Amino acid sequence: MIDTIFALGEGLLAAPWWSAIGWPVVWALIKVTLVLMIVMGAVTYTTLWERRLLAWAQIRMGPNRVGPWGLLQPIADAMKLMTKEVLRPAAAEKFLFYLGPVMTVMPAMAAWAVIPFGPDIALANINAGLLFLMAITSMEVYGVIISGWSSNSKYPFLGALRASSQMVSYEIAMGFCLVVVLMVSASLNLTDIVAGQNKGYFAQIGLNFLSWNWLPLLPIFLIYFISGLAETNRLPFDVIEGESEIVAGHMVEYSGMSWAMFQMAEYANIWLVSVLTTIMFLGGWLSPIDSVMFNWIPGWIWLGLKSFCVVTMFIWVRVSFPRFRYDQIMRLGWKIFIPVSLIWLVVVGGWMQTPWNIWK
């Protein structure tokens, strides 16, 4: 279908420059716009889904007044934020103060350039996609640090210090987890990583979900998911913006769309971590069972459903667990997750050299 649309667009004009330069550029812009619209729509309505789940957990209704069943509540919230004044403290560094939110949201959006939504559906299906993701997602912490420092205020600065140490700590554990997946997949290409989970004994008998990486790499899967909570500053790791300690951390002095950009980055990163979890450990767009009924469903729907379940797990953890102390978070990252992920890196490496290697 995508190839058909591309061919139709290429044939709109007979001029050589159109097929050589014009249409490829227009086609790339269309794909980028479509992906950004999907991501922004998911981010917008994840806020509503989170508020409804929190309400159900607390035995109340949640947003249900704006539109049918409250479905227009996110749009009303967006309109409210767009019309609010963006305030700036008098002592703040003006340029850096406004640069911080931009540097926070841009990596969260740029990372989607290499995310495959199907076997042949990606903005850029590059061989070093995993390496690109590890690099681009590490840049978000700079926006948080700049925002906290440029506000010239006590609470934002403390939040920025916490953010820098927490993100660096858990990025190491996440990096080791991704290295393990890289070892068993023998590729940095995200499409190849998904394809590598569709082989083995269980895949041959139709139980695809048992051939995915989550089962043989279960400790790595759990470490990656929990580290993802810490990377996205979600409960129980939200000491960066702990309301009872430093009000809202690095976002204290922000309002209007500046504050909204931080929220956009947070929820975009939640979806990014969820999609990556699905691609690395849950078979990506592969159906869980090899049957006509399941194979009839398009792969991008399977990817979306699995990612939505992981996002729901993020919200479930928020509503179920209390916030950790800062020293407990650092201890968990440095004394448990990093050593365990390193040990499993060695274990999997040794496993792959034995006759019982299941990733051949």
UniProtKB/Swiss-Prot annotation:
Gene Ontology terms for molecular function: NADH dehydrogenase activity; oxidoreductase activity, acting on NAD(P)H, quinone or similar compound as acceptor; quinone binding
PROSITE patterns assigned to the protein according to its UniProt record, in alphabetical order: COMPLEX1_ND1_1, COMPLEX1_ND1_2
Function statement: NDH-1 shuttles electrons from NADH, via FMN and iron-sulfur (Fe-S) centers, to quinones in the respiratory chain. The immediate electron acceptor for the enzyme in this species is believed to be ubiquinone. Couples the redox reaction to proton translocation (for every two electrons transferred, four hydrogen ions are translocated across the cytoplasmic membrane), and thus conserves the redox energy in a proton gradient. This subunit may bind ubiquinone.
Reaction(s) catalysed by this chain's protein: a quinone + NADH + 5 H(+)(in) = a quinol + NAD(+) + 4 H(+)(out)
Subcellular localization(s) per the UniProt record: Cell inner membrane
One Gene Ontology biological process: aerobic respiration
EC number: 7.1.1.-
Disulfide partners: none
EC primary class: translocase
Name recorded for this polypeptide: NADH-quinone oxidoreductase subunit H
A Gene Ontology term for the protein's cellular component: plasma membrane
Domain of life: Bacteria
Family designation: Belongs to the complex I subunit 1 family.
Quaternary structure, from the entry: NDH-1 is composed of 14 different subunits. Subunits NuoA, H, J, K, L, M, N constitute the membrane sector of the complex.
